[in-house]
Regions:
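Serine-dependent acyl-ester chemistry module
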Residues: 35, 116-120, 153-175
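Eukaryotic N-terminal targeting leaders
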Residues: 1-25, 186, 194, 210-213
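Short acidic/His/Gly/Ser-rich catalytic and metal-binding motifs that mark active-site loops
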Residues: 16-18, 67-71, 115-117, 154-159
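Structural recognition of the beta-strand scaffold that forms the well-ordered cores
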Residues: 5-15, 47, 56-61, 104-110, ...
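N-linked glycosylation sites
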Residues: 18, 25, 120, 124-125, ...
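A structural motif corresponding to the C-terminal end of an alpha-helix
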Residues: 48-55, 136-144, 176-197
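Conserved SGNH/GDSL esterase-like catalytic core that processes O-acyl groups on lipids
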Residues: 29-128
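Mobile gating loops/cap/lid regions near enzyme active sites that modulate substrate access
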Residues: 152-168, 187, 192-230
Length: 230
């Protein structure tokens, strides 16, 4: 069904949001301190962005999602046992009931859960699936596209000092993914408005200077259900 909204949309395909609450039949996350059933204690980045840009938020993201479930299956739940829609499926869902408009902004922020669920994948492999998703959006009419990268996997509070996350492949994954994302942004910049949110640089600054950001214990996790790499 076509959405009747006067404002341009901000559409988010990602691995966060409150979709886990839906796919878990309203059982996860169960901690009442999580705001609006998302993995946060308050409004999250996409809500702030939509408000700042005066865009109508359409958040299709689901915690635990990967870029393509045929490549790496995304999961959520207390034991990461519940399969979730990938960003490819999130895009297909949106395009089944709406079409891009000239002022709509599409944010595709994905790629971290692949290495969390499978330590043998590479950043370039994940990038190829992200590129397919962006091509789908572009061919459907999307002309404002934003991508984002992440902090280094081995510095996540839930993975810090975990033996399964110390391999050379894991440590190089985010740099390789970021190179691929920059290439995608550059390639499509000739045909659309594109941008990359450099979260990796920000998080590296936070890790190096946590006190400047008001962080006392940078490696303490608030959400501890991280899949174990065997």
């Amino acid at each position: 069904m076509k959405t009747e909204i006067s404002l341009p949309l901000a559409i988010f395909f990602s691995d966060n949001g409150n979709g886990s609450w839906v796919v878990s039949n309203a059982t996860w996350p169960s901690d009442p301190s999580y705001f609006a059933h998302s993995f946060s204690d308050g409004p999250v980045w996409n809500e702030h962005v939509a408000n700042a840009l005066h865009l109508e938020l359409v958040n299709i993201a689901t915690g635990g999602a990967t870029t393509n479930n045929g490549f790496v299956q995304g999961r959520t739940g207390p034991e990461s046992e519940i399969p979730v829609p990938s960003t490819a499926e999130q895009i297909a869902s949106f395009l089944s009931w709406d079409v891009p408009r000239p002022g709509d902004v599409f944010v595709h922020w994905s790629g971290v859960n692949e290495i969390l669920f499978n330590p043998n994948v590479t950043g370039s492999q994940t990038t190829s699936w992200i590129n397919e998703n962006i091509e789908t959006l572009y061919r459907a009419g999307a002309r404002n596209i934003v991508l984002g990268n992440y902090n280094d996997i081995e510095t996540f509070p839930g993975t810090y000092n975990a033996s399964g996350y110390q391999s050379d492949n894991v440590k190089s994954y985010m740099d390789d993914l970021s190179i691929g994302l920059r290439n995608i942004v550059g390639a499509y910049s000739a045909y659309a408005n594109t941008a990359l949110v450099e979260a990796q640089t920000l998080f590296r600054n936070i890790a190096a200077n946590p006190e400047e950001y008001g962080i006392d214990e940078k490696y303490n996790a608030t959400y501890s259900s991280i899949p174990t790499i065997q």
